[in-house]
Amino acid sequence: MDCYRTSLSSSWIYPTVILCLFGFFSMMRPSEPFLIPYLSGPDKNLTSAEITNEIFPVWTYSYLVLLLPVFVLTDYVRYKPVIILQGISFIITWLLLLFGQGVKTMQVVEFFYGMVTAAEVAYYAYIYSVVSPEHYQRVSGYCRSVTLAAYTAGSVLAQLLVSLANMSYFYLNVISLASVSVAFLFSLFLPMPKKSMFFHAKPSREIKKSSSVNPVLEETHEGEAPGCEEQKPTSEILSTSGKLNKGQLNSLKPSNVTVDVFVQWFQDLKECYSSKRLFYWSLWWAFATAGFNQVLNYVQILWDYKAPSQDSSIYNGAVEAIATFGGAVAAFAVGYVKVNWDLLGELALVVFSVVNAGSLFLMHYTANIWACYAGYLIFKSSYMLLITIAVFQIAVNLNVERYALVFGINTFIALVIQTIMTVIVVDQRGLNLPVSIQFLVYGSYFAVIAGIFLMRSMYITYSTKSQKDVQSPAPSENPDVSHPEEESNIIMSTKL
């Protein structure tokens, strides 16, 4: 029996199933679409101003403060302890949400929820430490799909219970507490990884290429962004550099290894962001994600402002379910659309940023709750479609380690931007704007993003046309020779 359990645990199926079960129950939270009616209702008796200006900003600030330390800690302790910590934070969040009272307690709730969101990196990174590379794509798809399915199922369940069974919002939170508690139990059964991406990367793998050749200096393959060639994790580089063997690596002090890892991170990020293509897609990712998170934080308050939950039937659960499902379908469809994203990608950023701005303006100006719901559906679906394209454009030429770094830094920059918006627009120490005016600001924000990338798209189109005119009289030129004027146009040469 022990042999069977050991062989099962060592395969990729067992950790994938356990992780997916954790992901499902941690995201199956039917109380989520009805959080604002619960907080402003008789259970908590909080005002809209208290929720908007005093409670919700705490999540943004705590997420920003915790993200980078948790990102480093996740790799250092090899993922599982941070996943368990996330499960504990989930339970504390919902216990306080159920039985706590007052603004201060709800601010503590937001702090622990910031811990939950900061620890999400462990859920997505864990699988790369226990699954062989040939299963990465499949398993990553499972993990992401199950969270979308769980969120959709939770939203549908919530709407059915509220509309048909007239269930109290309090009991929706009881169901959420039970669900996240089950997720915590599943986290205890995850196998402990023997390696991680950076601090505990295995140094004993065979190196196919000669260690005397620096991969950064090798000729870039056609279609790869300069400086973003696939590179080995730090500890593997140390062990294969000809200066340190495995025994010497093990004898290094942990502080030295930590410094080496941070130095390698800095070098990797510097090389990756030197690619203009990756830089501009990352720029859109950071700015758009900041705006998207801000809208998600406060959209329920806007709905409650347009149609108060005490006076009318609300359909937040149905809207969230449709929006999530529609976004997932749009993101899935991207893989089957034959488009040269290198040529039209930034134009797509312009078009959909305009769509996002228009949907937010609609949500601000309309007095009809159904039009407000429709604007949100359009906004969320278009963002999920574009973020899928952006992730692919960024990750296509990066290995897992470099993608994790770029993802972490992009998320951190998005949080910095979101924090600045929160301080200026939302916080009581800033402008303290009412929620309806906030959405006018967010719509203007996406309009500015569209304007920036419109100018960038026009510049690329003009540069490409000029370059073709220059190259056409000289067809005998060596196509492998890089021209100085092509540097700003490097995205045109990428193969998908």
UniProtKB/Swiss-Prot annotation:
Compartments where found: Membrane
Organism encoding this protein: Homo sapiens (Human)
PANTHER family linked to this entry: FOLATE TRANSPORTER, THIAMINE TRANSPORTER 2
Main location: membrane
Family membership noted in the UniProt record: Belongs to the reduced folate carrier (RFC) transporter (TC 2.A.48) family.
Keyword GTP-binding belongs to the record: no
Effect of Q86H: Significant decrease in pyridoxine transport
Span list, region Disordered: 468-496
Variant or mutagenesis effect after changing S168P: Significant decrease in pyridoxine transport
UniProt-annotated site: Essential for pyridoxine transport, residues: Q86, G87, I91, T93, W94, S168, N173
UniProt entry keywords in alphabetical sequence: Disease variant, Glycoprotein, Membrane, Transmembrane, Transmembrane helix, Transport
Membrane topology type: Multi-pass membrane protein
GO biological process: pyridoxine transport; thiamine diphosphate biosynthetic process; thiamine transmembrane transport; thiamine transport; thiamine-containing compound metabolic process; transmembrane transport
Sequence ranges on the Cytoplasmic membrane side: 1-7, 75-81, 132-144, 191-282, 338-342, 397-405, 456-496
Tissue note: Widely expressed but most abundant in placenta, kidney and liver.
GO MF assignments: thiamine transmembrane transporter activity
Name of the protein in question: Thiamine transporter 2
pH dependence: Optimum pH is 7.5.
Function recorded in the entry: Mediates high affinity thiamine uptake, probably via a proton anti-port mechanism. Has no folate transport activity. Mediates H(+)-dependent pyridoxine transport.
Glycosylation: residue positions: N45, N166
Top-rank taxon: Eukaryota
Topology, Extracellular side: 29-53, 103-110, 166-169, 304-316, 364-375, 427-434
